[in-house]
């Protein structure tokens, strides 16, 4: 079965970070006293370690780079409590995750707070997000029920994948990975760094191809990422992110029986 997902999966997100204080002073009327008030406004949906009262784990970018290797992205969560992830043997990008026994249809998976579960059955097609591991800055996994502003069925838990912003440090990297069954991955990334006017940009391109251990599981995938940042001062930061991961892969949906193996081979 040949699954072609060259329909580009694209996330474009704007992030505004604003911190400010507002000074309100009531005008004096008659004998009333002046009232001074400070109003602080902020929104944060990221759990803080040892402060937010939920069972949550945070996987940093350094951990992903060190331990992922040629595994599929969900498999990095196997060291997380109450999480089970597997390739499932079907093909490239056909992984699945269980949290506390609940399958993906009962887990809310989000990228920068945007749900990516299928709108019909709630499933997650990781083959559409094969390049997300290259652009992830951190990932939080909340186990069990939690408060959410979105109408999502997340009785098993919630995953929020945060992508990189434009890197403030200038530099680049080129990587090449090789594995069994013709697996190879090449990646190029470059960061301009933040200039004197507050502008910064990051760019990444990657290609992954090869096959799994089973016959007929060839695949090829690409990943592109661009981020543009503007920080005019210390309290304002504007980030624009654009990423996508077109790919195709052959899928092994069912294993042959012993009788079929004897008659037709593998």
Task: Give the location of each predicted region.
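Cleavable N-terminal targeting peptides that direct proteins into the secretory/outer-membrane pathway or into
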Residues: 1-30
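Short, glycine-/polar-rich solvent-exposed loops and beta-turns at beta-strand/coil boundaries
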Residues: 31-33, 52, 82-93, 151-155, ...
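Transmembrane beta-strand segments of Gram-negative outer membrane beta-barrel proteins
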Residues: 36-37, 136-141, 157, 163-178, ...
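N-terminal periplasmic "start-of-domain" segments of outer-membrane beta-barrel proteins
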Residues: 36-67, 96
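Extracytoplasmic beta-strand/coil segments of soluble accessory domains associated
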Residues: 74-115, 137
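Outer-membrane beta-barrel architecture
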Residues: 75, 98, 140, 160, ...
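Short acidic/polar hinge/loop motifs at secondary-structure boundaries
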Residues: 115-143, 162-163
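Transmembrane beta-barrel wall of Gram-negative outer-membrane proteins
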Residues: 171, 178-209, 214-252
């Amino acid at each position: 079965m040949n699954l072609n997902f060259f329909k580009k999966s694209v996330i474009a997100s704007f992030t505004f970070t604003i911190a400010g204080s507002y000074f309100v002073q009531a005008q004096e009327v008659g004998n009333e006293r002046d009232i001074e008030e400070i109003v602080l406004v902020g929104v944060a949906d990221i759990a803080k370690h040892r402060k937010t009262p939920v069972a949550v784990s945070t996987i940093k970018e350094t951990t992903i780079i060190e331990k992922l290797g040629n595994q599929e992205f969900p498999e990095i969560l196997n060291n997380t409590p109450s999480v089970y992830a597997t390739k499932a043997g079907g093909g490239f990008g056909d992984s699945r995750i269980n949290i506390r026994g609940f399958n993906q249809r009962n887990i809310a998976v989000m990228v920068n707070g945007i749900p990516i579960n299928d709108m019909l059955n709630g499933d997650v097609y990781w083959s559409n997000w094969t390049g997300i591991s290259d652009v992830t800055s951190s990932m939080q996994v909340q186990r069990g029920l939690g408060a959410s502003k979105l109408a999502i069925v997340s009785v098993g838990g919630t995953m929020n994948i945060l992508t990189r912003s434009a890197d403030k440090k200038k530099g680049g990297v080129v990587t090449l990975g090789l594995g069994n069954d013709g697996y190879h991955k090449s990646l190029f990334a470059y960061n301009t760094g933040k200039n004197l006017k507050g502008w910064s940009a990051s760019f990444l391109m990657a290609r992954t191809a090869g096959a799994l251990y089973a016959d007929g599981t060839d695949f090829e995938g690409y990943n592109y990422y661009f981020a543009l940042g503007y920080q005019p001062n210390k309290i304002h930061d504007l980030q624009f992110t654009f990423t996508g991961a077109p790919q195709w892969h052959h899928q092994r949906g069912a294993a042959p029986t012993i009788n079929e193996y004897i008659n037709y081979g593998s």
